[in-house]
UniProtKB/Swiss-Prot annotation:
CDD domains given in the database record: ATP-synt_F1_beta_C, ATP-synt_F1_beta_N, F1-ATPase_beta_CD
Membrane topology term: Peripheral membrane protein
GO molecular function, one term: proton-transporting ATP synthase activity, rotational mechanism
Residues annotated for ATP binding in this entry: 150-157
EC number per UniProt: 7.1.2.2
Official protein name in the record: ATP synthase subunit beta
Key words, A-Z: ATP synthesis, ATP-binding, Cell membrane, CF(1), Hydrogen ion transport, Ion transport, Membrane, Nucleotide-binding, Translocase, Transport
Keyword ATP-binding in record: yes
Assembly information from the UniProt record: F-type ATPases have 2 components, CF(1) - the catalytic core - and CF(0) - the membrane proton channel. CF(1) has five subunits: alpha(3), beta(3), gamma(1), delta(1), epsilon(1). CF(0) has three main subunits: a(1), b(2) and c(9-12). The alpha and beta chains form an alternating ring which encloses part of the gamma chain. CF(1) is attached to CF(0) by a central stalk formed by the gamma and epsilon chains, while a peripheral stalk is formed by the delta and b chains.
Lineage of producing organism: Bacteria, Bacillati, Chloroflexota, Dehalococcoidia, Dehalococcoidales
Length: 464
């Protein structure tokens, strides 16, 4: 028989039997015709006796043994090209926005090889984000991979939404957003925000959210990546790829691994963790044709940075933004820890001597303040030397100046968002380090844009 039939159904795992001469290849998409459309499966393993074990992308409710299964003879393929811009898709490439079918130029399989070594090209060009703490401490490389790491509720999604607003608005190319195992409400909010800001016509969005089956959450990142690869390779564009959240991709892999009966490894993760992460991350690359700059939110379970699921991501990142709960508790937003965040291109040969020196001096002052906090807690400020008192005062001003009102949180805070250029960021911190603003109150530096805004705020406070 050319087609197969369902032998066993356990949750979202379906066993299908084929004849010996028509066995489907691994990762082939299989279809089961249903009254209300079709059910799509993906072949995961050959288990012997002409049987294959598959994972379903759609709920298996009502599926019975003996149902006919059709081999599409190719991996799951999704629409790509300019007609996907401004639209929202699911893992199968079907539109979710009730705006009719997509007339795509072509479709591409979601399983592809990474670019060959001789096609790769790395850039050392800084991509300005308009966020002071990131541009100063962990500058982004155009065509690089950037990770925003943090536990639950410290602001990863808000930060990634702000980056979409700042960079996609300023950026000329196309953007792809992949929602991987996150909240549907946030995806809905993001869609409306992007529509209001005028960014949506240059953006393709794909969603496989928390309520979806594990196979969907595992493959949705590949669907988004395939669409981004088309813009890079065929359109020769510089593409922005946003993934929220890459940890949910790992978690979906863990669920799939358990469903397929594989032996778990450390902390219950799948034994193929590094391979799966590498297969995804190596495809997010910049070639001679174009670049993919990726921003990935990384959930850190229980704030444990040694968790294998988090560690698997580290080695692939060019810049790492660590979001710290203690800063969020003090309402210092964005809650980026300037001492734990880093970037491959924070190098005087790339960013220039002045930027490098100011960034390192800021970190030095903040580190000294951190070292002195135990002394201050036990003995009080009076016991510090004059030099240390000055360091603490400047560190507290720097801490507050690292905060910034965001465009995407205007509705919550009532403060208009601020985009600060890199030159203004460097000037502001340099003046604080030089002591030009030692006379201004600390509060004047909180939630302002440029250093001139801080001076204006200080005048307002003194007049009050």
């Amino acid at each position: 028989m050319a087609n197969g039939k369902v032998i066993q159904v356990i949750g979202s795992v379906v066993d299908v039997e084929f004849s010996a001469d028509s066995m489907p290849a691994l990762f082939n998409a299989l279809e089961i015709p249903r009254d209300n459309g079709k059910m799509v499966l993906e072949v995961q393993s050959h288990v012997g006796n002409n049987r294959v074990k598959c994972l379903s992308f759609t709920p298996t409710d009502g599926l019975e043994r003996g149902a006919e299964v059709i081999d599409t003879k190719r991996p799951l393929s999704v629409p790509v090209g300019r007609n996907t811009l401004g639209r929202i898709f699911n893992v199968l490439g079907e539109p979710l926005d009730n705006r009719g079918d997509v007339k795509a130029e072509k479709t591409m399989p979601i399983h592809r090889s990474a670019p060959a070594m001789d096609e790769l090209e790395s850039s050392a060009q800084v991509l300005e984000t308009g966020l002071k703490v990131i541009d100063l401490i962990a500058p982004f490389a155009r065509g690089g991979k950037i990770g925003a790491l943090g536990g639950a509720g410290v602001g990863k999604t808000v930060l990634i939404q702000e980056l979409i607003r700042n960079i996609a608005t300023e950026h000329e190319g196309f953007s792809v957003f992949a929602g991987v195992g996150e909240r549907s409400r946030e995806g809905n909010d993001l869609w409306h925000e992007m529509e209001d800001s005028g960014v949506l016509p240059k953006t393709t969005m794909v969603f496989g959210q928390m309520n979806e089956l594990p196979a969907v959450r595992l493959r949705i990142a590949l669907t988004g990546l395939t669409m981004a690869e088309y813009f890079r390779d065929e359109e020769r564009q510089d593409v922005l790829l946003f993934i929220d959240n890459i940890y949910r991709y790992t978690l979906a892999g863990m669920e799939v691994s358990a469903l397929l009966g594989r032996m778990p490894s450390a902390v219950g993760y799948q034994p193929t963790l590094a391979t799966e992460m590498g297969a995804l991350q190596e495809r997010i690359a910049s070639t001679k044709q174009g670049s993919i700059t990726s921003f990935q939110a990384v959930y850190v379970p229980a704030d444990d940075y040694t968790d294998p699921g988090v560690v698997a991501t580290f080695g692939h990142l060019d810049a790492m933004i660590a979001l710290e709960r203690s800063l969020a508790e003090q309402a210092l937003y964005p809650a980026v820890d300037p001492l734990a965040s880093n970037s491959r291109i924070l190098d005087p040969q790339v960013v220039g001597e002045e930027h490098y020196q100011v960034a390192r001096d800021v970190q030095k002052v903040l580190q000294r303040y951190k070292d002195l906090q135990d002394v201050i807690a036990i003995l009080g400020m009076e016991e510090l030397s004059e030099e240390d008192k000055l360091t603490v005062a400047r560190a507290r001003r720097i801490q507050r100046f690292l905060t910034q009102p965001m465009f995407v949180s205007e509705v919550f805070t009532g403060r208009p968002g601020q985009y600060v250029s890199l030159a203004e960021t460097i000037r502001g911190f340099k003046e604080i380090l030089e002591g030009k603003h030692d006379s201004l109150p600390e509060q004047a530096f909180y939630m302002v844009g440029t250093i001139d805004d801080a001076v204006a705020e200080a005048k307002k406070l003194s007049a009050a």
